[in-house]
């Protein structure tokens, strides 16, 4: 299945003076059509509540919403996929869990990382 991967990604961050919701709204207003929610500081319950808010903003703007690392939440929220920053993640197990319809991306820091992910054929994009 061919998936659309935007060329303009915005990654939210845990910032002291700007919430993920504010960052998402500003990014969408600026033309971003791919939002990667990168929150590493909240409980699953807090994440789910915030993801619902982000999904509403993304839906309003026609933007794709990708979660960083929290693939276990995909069946509880309206997000289109997950991005794994752990180069050693079990991409086969993650792909099996999330299914073929969800987007799966992975971070790469070396050419070896890129080769391993590409050879496995399980990720939709490498960043």
Language-model region placement:
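Conserved N-terminal beta1-alpha1 strand-loop-helix module at the mouth
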Residues: 1-91, 97-111, 116-124
């Amino acid at each position: 299945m061919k998936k659309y991967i935007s060329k303009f990604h915005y990654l939210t961050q845990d910032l002291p003076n700007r919430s993920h919701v504010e960052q998402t709204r500003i990014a969408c207003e600026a033309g971003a059509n791919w939002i990667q929610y990168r929150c590493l500081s909240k409980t699953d319950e807090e994440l789910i509540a915030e993801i619902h808010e982000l999904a509403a903003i993304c839906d309003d703007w026609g933007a794709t919403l990708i979660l960083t690392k929290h693939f276990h939440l995909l069946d509880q929220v309206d997000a289109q996929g997950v991005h794994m920053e752990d180069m050693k993640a079990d991409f086969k197990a993650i792909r099996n869990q999330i299914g073929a319809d969800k987007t799966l991306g992975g971070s790469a820091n070396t050419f070896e990382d890129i080769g391993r992910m590409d050879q496995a054929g399980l990720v939709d994009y490498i960043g």
